[in-house]
Amino acid sequence: MEFAFYICGLIAILATLRVITHTNPVHALLYLIISLLAISGVFFSLGAYFAGALEIIVYAGAIMVLFVFVVMMLNLGGSEIEQERQWLKPQVWIGPAILSAIMLVVIVYAILGVNDQGIDGTPISAKAVGITLFGPYVLAVELASMLLLAGLVVAFHVGREERAGEVLSNRKDDSAKRKTEEHA
């Protein structure tokens, strides 16, 4: 399992560097997904199976879906035909494909290398994780959720385009301003 730890760690570092250096947000999201899956592989190789599963479900699943929706709302991905043709070029998808293939080899190696006597660690139940998470760390969990929500709202407002005739609010001051702009 030491081999799996080092390979997953290397993949996580390389994918994270690509997230930071990539200019296209859609490609950066793909590398971020690979990085999160590699980090879950690190957890699995260390014997923290529950933490690895949570990493996949929460981060690589739920939060990445949130990021994809934000990119779609901001229209950062672009849906032009020429850009979609560029995405099919090998230099775009070969990096994530190679890293994913290495992760597949590591996962198959880890599955085949499991001993028949079971897991050597003490299992941690979801109830114990929940009690710990929402006991002494409840403030941190709530602050993290508020931070994610604030980031989503800010990204929406920054990326939103103003359209002619769009009603932004129902306040009296805004409606009077809108009427003067329409007559001007």
Swiss-Prot record:
Keywords: Cell inner membrane, Cell membrane, Membrane, NAD, Quinone, Translocase, Transmembrane, Transmembrane helix, Ubiquinone. The keyword RNA-binding does not apply. It is found in: Cell inner membrane. It comes from the Bacteria. Its EC number is 7.1.1.-. It is an enzyme of class 7 (translocase). One of its GO terms (biological process) is respiratory electron transport chain. It is a multi-pass membrane protein. Pfam families: Oxidored_q3. One of its GO terms (molecular function) is quinone binding. Residues 49-53, 113-137 are periplasmic. Disulfide bonds: none annotated. It catalyses: a quinone + NADH + 5 H(+)(in) = a quinol + NAD(+) + 4 H(+)(out). Residues 22-27, 75-91, 159-184 are cytoplasmic. The chain crosses the membrane at residues 1-21, 28-48, 54-74, 92-112, 138-158. Gene3D superfamilies: NADH-ubiquinone/plastoquinone oxidoreductase chain 6, subunit NuoJ (1.20.120.1200). GO terms for cellular component: membrane; NADH dehydrogenase complex; plasma membrane; respiratory chain complex I. The keyword Transcription regulation does not apply. Composed of 13 different subunits. Subunits NuoA, H, J, K, L, M, N constitute the membrane sector of the complex. NDH-1 shuttles electrons from NADH, via FMN and iron-sulfur (Fe-S) centers, to quinones in the respiratory chain. The immediate electron acceptor for the enzyme in this species is believed to be ubiquinone. Couples the redox reaction to proton translocation (for every two electrons transferred, four hydrogen ions are translocated across the cytoplasmic membrane), and thus conserves the redox energy in a proton gradient. Belongs to the complex I subunit 6 family. This is NADH-quinone oxidoreductase subunit J. It comes from Escherichia coli (strain K12). The lineage of its organism: Bacteria, Pseudomonadati, Pseudomonadota, Gammaproteobacteria, Enterobacterales.
